[in-house]
Regions:
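A short acidic, often aromatic-flanked loop/helix-cap motif at beta-alpha or helix-coil junctions
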Residues: 53-59, 142-145, 251-257
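Structural recognition of the beta-strand scaffold that forms the well-ordered cores
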Residues: 5-6, 69-70, 91-94, 135
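NAD(P)H-binding glycine-rich loop region in Rossmannoid oxidoreductase-like domains
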Residues: 31-87, 94, 99-107
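Terminal hydrophobic/aromatic helix or amphipathic segment near a protein terminus
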Residues: 217-218, 227-290
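General small-molecule cofactor/ligand-binding pocket signal
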Residues: 30, 46-48, 135, 243-249
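Oxidoreductase cofactor-interface core, primarily capturing Rossmann-like NAD(P)-dependent enzymes
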Residues: 2-28, 32-35, 40, 102-240
């Protein structure tokens, strides 16, 4: 019987554990968490409290584990990768539930504390030095980011500053949006979106097929929309309250009081303008509509 460790007991981790416990094939599921979770009492799941900064504690928790699925990023994931490789884990799924890996920048300037690049580099190193294989599940943006409560309503993203409503593109609770509509070449910016529930189902289905057959990356998407369409659909869902466009220049000199910090938005604009030195006016949505 395959022993699967899911690192992270809430949000996506809980969805994965609950669906694996109900899968047609039998798996021994162990949830690694920083604290106890009584909500697992009704599931055929073992909860193990771990300290991700304690090498000996992690090593003990990973004994006999075949597959590790991590649902959080940062330095603690790096510790988990090291311990998994050193303790004979065969397969590792990092917390890289976002865009396709071949289209990501080498360093995430918007979320530098995620250590995403470092995690992939470490996994490549352990692939050479051990028998551990790894696979990324690329799903684009979680649709639940656009809930009124953001990803936090799903207990996702609290440790990586992604939980709050409005942490990406738009905030449906305040009827505001900030997004670059076209890139430096004038092409429409589009995003792939997938519900976190569908991501969990996809991962479980892949486990049923067998990790031994997994490639380096498995991709999925629930939809692919331009950022204008994302804003438009959210506007229609908000009882018809519109989010109207406001054109802003690449260099910000001020910001509306309801917007995100200008430094963060400027970073996003600079990243999109990086391939060229041309000055292009980007269409940014940043408005407040009356309810």
């Amino acid at each position: 019987m395959m022993r699967i460790a899911i690192a992270g007991g809430t949000g996506l981790g809980y969805l994965l554990a609950s669906q694996l416990s109900e899968a047609a094939y039998a798996y021994q599921v162990v949830v690694l968490s920083r604290s106890q979770h009584p909500e697992y009492a009704g599931l055929d799941v073992q909860v193990t409290v771990v300290d991700y900064n304690d090498e000996e504690n992690l090593s003990f928790a990973l004994q006999g584990i075949n597959l590790v699925i991590c649902t959080f990023s940062g330095n603690e994931q790096l510790n988990l990768i090291n311990s998994a490789a050193q303790n004979g884990v065969q397969f590792f799924v990092p917390s890289e539930f976002e865009g396709s890996i071949d289209k990501r920048p080498d360093n995430d300037q918007l979320y530098p504390d995620s250590y995403s690049t470092e995690a992939r580099q470490l996994l490549r190193r352990w692939t050479r030095l051990s028998q551990m294989k790894w696979t990324v599940f690329s799903c684009g943006v979680f649709m639940e980011r656009f809930l009124p409560g953001g990803l936090g309503s799903m207990f996702i993203g609290y440790r990586s500053n992604l939980a709050m409503a409005g942490s990406y593109l738009l905030d449906t609770s305040s009827y505001t949006a900030e997004c670059v509509e076209k890139n430096a070449r004038g092409h429409t910016v589009r995003v792939c979106l997938t519900s976190v529930y569908d991501v969990a189902q996809f991962v479980v289905a892949a486990i049923v097929l067998g990790p031994a057959s997994w490639p380096r990356e498995l991709t999925m998407r629930g939809d692919r929309l331009s950022v204008r369409d994302v804003v438009g659909q959210c506007s229609r869902a908000l009882n018809g309250n519109p989010i109207k466009p406001l054109t802003m220049y690449p260099k910000l000199t001020h910001q509306p009081p309801f917007s995100f910090p200008s430094g963060r938005l400027q970073t996003l604009i600079d990243l999109l303008l990086r391939p060229t030195s041309r000055v292009i006016i980007q269409s940014i949505y940043s408005t407040v509509s009356s309810k």
